[in-house]
Amino acid sequence: MSDPVVRLRELRRSFSQGGVTIDVLRGVNLEIRPGEIVALLGPSGSGKSTMLQAIGLLEGGFSGLIEIAGTDASKLSGDDRTALRRDHLGFVYQFHHLLPDFNAIENVVLPQLVAGTDRAVAEARAAELLSALGLAKRLDHRPSQLSGGEQQRVAVARALANRPEMVLADEPTGNLDEATADRVLEEFLKLVRGEGSAALIATHNERLALRMDRVVRLHEGVLE
C-alpha cells in the first residue's frame, strides 16, 4: 500500500476568547492515500476550516504531527513550509478569490509562473484545465464577466494547475445554488480523479459528501 499523502496524528488547536479557552481540534488523527477523495463532514463552526488551514500549513498554533508527502511540516522553516505547500497542495475556497484584473486563463497561469513553469507550458496547461471544465470559450473573460459557477470552475483549475498531490477544498460549492453546485462538484471530482490527485473536501452537506470515496465526520473536535 502506498504511503499517505497526508498524515495527521493528535492534531490539536485551541483559541482563547474572553478569557475562556476553546478547544477546536482535540486530537485529530487522519491518513489520506494518493488518489483518495475524502469528505470532511460537519456543521458550520465545527472546526473544518481550522483543520484545512492546519493541513494547508496556512497558520501556526497547532500541536501534533502534520505530515505532507512524507515530510513532517513542524520541522521546516517558513520558506520550506511555503515550498512544501506550493509543490504538493492545491486549494479551493467557498469564495473563489480570483484576481479581478486578470482573465480566466491568467488566473490559472499565474501560480504556475510562481512555481517556475515556462509561460508557454503554463498557458497550455491552463487552457487544458479550463477547457475540461467547459470554459474553452471564456478564457479571456475576467471574473466579473463570469457567472458564480464559472468563477468557481476557474478556481478549481487554478488549484490543479501545478499538479498537486493533494487538493484541499473548503465548502467549494457553498456559495452556489443547488443545481450549479451539483454540476461544479461533478466536474471537480471528475477532474481530480483524472489528474490522480487526492482531495479533502470540507462540507456541511451530507448529500454531497456521500459522492466522495470516504466520509469522515468532525464532531466536538475529533473525527468519527
Swiss-Prot record:
Record GO terms (molecular function): ATP binding; ATP hydrolysis activity; transmembrane transporter activity
SUPFAM superfamilies associated with the record: P-loop containing nucleoside triphosphate hydrolases
PROSITE patterns in alphabetical order: ABC_TRANSPORTER_1 (PS00211), ABC_TRANSPORTER_2 (PS50893), LOLD (PS51244)
Compartment list: Cell inner membrane
Major location category of this protein: membrane
Keywords assigned: ATP-binding, Cell inner membrane, Cell membrane, Membrane, Nucleotide-binding, Translocase, Transport
GO cellular component terms, A-Z: plasma membrane
Enzyme Commission number(s): 7.6.2.-
EC top class, as a word: translocase
Record's function text: Part of the ABC transporter complex LolCDE involved in the translocation of mature outer membrane-directed lipoproteins, from the inner membrane to the periplasmic chaperone, LolA. Responsible for the formation of the LolA-lipoprotein complex in an ATP-dependent manner.
Family: Belongs to the ABC transporter superfamily. Lipoprotein translocase (TC 3.A.1.125) family.
Quaternary organization: The complex is composed of two ATP-binding proteins (LolD) and two transmembrane proteins (LolC and LolE).
Name of the molecule in the record: Lipoprotein-releasing system ATP-binding protein LolD
Native source species: Novosphingobium aromaticivorans (strain ATCC 700278 / DSM 12444 / CCUG 56034 / CIP 105152 / NBRC 16084 / F199)
Gene assigned in the entry: lolD
